[in-house]
Amino acid sequence: MNTDEKNQNALIICGFILISAICVSPMILFGKTLVLRDTFFEFRFLYDFSRENIINGIIPLWNPYSNCGQPFIANPQSAFFYPLNWIYALLNFNQAYTLFIFIHLFMAGFFMHAFVRPIVKRNWISFFGGVIFMLNGLLISRIEFLSEFASIVWLPAILALLRVTLLAPSWLNSVLLGLAMAIQFFAGHTQTFYYTAFFGLIFLIFLVFVHFVREKKTAAVLPSMKFLIAAGLLALLIIMVQLAPTYELFSHSLRSQADYDAKTHLASVHPMHALTFLFPYLFGWPGYKSYWGSTYEFWASSFYVGVMPFVFCLLAALLFYRVKKTRSGHRPLEISYFLFFLVWFAIAFIIALGDYSPVFRIFHAVVPGFDKFRWPSSSLVFCMLSMSIMAPLGLKWLLQETSNRALKKNRWVTVTFGALIAVFVTIAVVMN
């Protein structure tokens, strides 16, 4: 790594730190805090109880303060073993809460940057992808639900380490992947962990195809498999301290029953909600009596990414076919990544439709474990992930179009881009 690359990396890290600091600046500078429902009516008391037991050197198997008592460690939402939750034992809740949000926003941006960088091969374009992921409406709305917020943040890190372990197998990469998977599980949102494992398997198959099968190097993938299997076994061994009691608790819960009603209608996203990609407040605002959308509450269908990322995703769809083939006659890998995440975006959105889509019912009936989760809209996280990759590719291809040829030959690109920006910004300002 040369000096210029080191300087760029340092600036990018500083950029993510600055953006994260701006997001929590009212909490740092003015002593304010986000008074959110679940944060203060559930998570605060869970973390206070954890703090009390950590200080006394106790692993709290039982919580005597809730109803007539209930298992504590076995409840994944307690996230007792999540390392970043231990800051609540060192600081008062408001200080720890501020630091928790700051750290996770930074990690969301940096992890996505690390995932996108090998695809776009330009630091500042991958930085754009990181900013999209860390500031999208879905992630910000999940700050209320600290376990889900923390779990989502680890998604791009796991995918990045999965790719690195496959393409550059080593015991170090294998251990890092295993640790990342275990930490995401400890964060406490089982549905996000389940979706990550499900998507990770499909992503792994995609990587094997584009990097090995397509290049006729199928046998070369075999040495990587032992490192991936080792990572999975390491993660399983680590999480058993949480998984074993959670599984026992699950066997006594309503979700273990064959006739369990997941009430998926509460978080089934109506197809008209696709408009909120541009107009986040089209169906109302957060809060009681201020929202009239199809889902239970505003946050359940919140997935606004902003006008610029949306436009760059459209540009990627317009420009990808113009990217030249490589000397081997194949399209560049970035085209394969774009098409993969475009398809996965569509699948994730169809799943999020829940009861409005027959496809969801197929997943619900066929995929093991899928019927035990209540919120179909949680799959929207993969829409955000996909857009955080497609938008940087759209930006890269736009820059290539305007630099490789005479401007007059690319007038249609310039006019289209300018028109899209003008139209969407105008409508967004009026509607929002």
Task: Tell where the protein language model's regions lie, with residue ranges.
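Start-transfer (signal-anchor) and selected internal transmembrane alpha helices
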Residues: M1-P26, V221-G232, L314, L333-F341, ...
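Transmembrane signal-anchor helices characteristic of membrane glycosylation enzymes that use polyprenol
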Residues: Q8-E42, A231-E248, I347-I350, V425
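Membrane-embedded helix bundles of polyisoprenyl
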Residues: F16-I19, G109-P118, N123-H211, F227-T246, ...
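Membrane-interface coil-to-helix junctions
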Residues: I19-M112, V131-I152, P156, S251-L254, ...
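Transmembrane alpha-helices and membrane-interface helical segments
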Residues: F110-A114, P118, A157-V164, G200-V208, ...
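Perimembrane helix-loop-helix junctions
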Residues: T196-A235, F320-R327, R331, L395, ...
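Hydrophobic, aromatic-rich transmembrane alpha-helices
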Residues: G306-I335, A346, I350, A422
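Transmembrane helical bundles and short interhelical boundary loops of multi-pass, membrane-embedded
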Residues: S403, L407-N432
